[in-house]
Amino acid sequence: MKLEILESFENKYPNRDYTIEIVNPEFTSVCPITGLPDFGTITIRYVPNQRCVELKSLKYYFFEFRNAGIFYENITNKVLDDMVALLEPRSISVITEWKARGGITETVSVHYTSQS
């Protein structure tokens, strides 16, 4: 989960508020307690400022989680923190929706709004 993997490009419309939504329905990680794989959908929704995330780099960033033992809540917050560091967006939300484990599903959401 290296921030250095992520790349961005210049937003050609920085004076316009518009929303970018990215959905990865095949997100995987590993439960740090059981070592079993976790499967989920991750959605990133943001209003860009000066930069936009480059999707191929985001795909490789997501691959970094495949073998990582990490809790759902930590994944969601880590992705938000890394995206804020990379993009400095006007606002951003990260939502993770996890497949049932033992009959229980979980959804974690976190939001950031720029103070400027």
Swiss-Prot record:
Belongs to the GTP cyclohydrolase I family. QueF type 1 subfamily. Its EC number is 1.7.1.13. The gene is queF. GO terms for molecular function: preQ1 synthase activity. This is NADPH-dependent 7-cyano-7-deazaguanine reductase. Pfam families: QueF. The keyword NADP applies. It comes from Chlorobium chlorochromatii (strain CaD3). It comes from the Bacteria. Substrate binds at V53, E54, L55, Y72, E73.
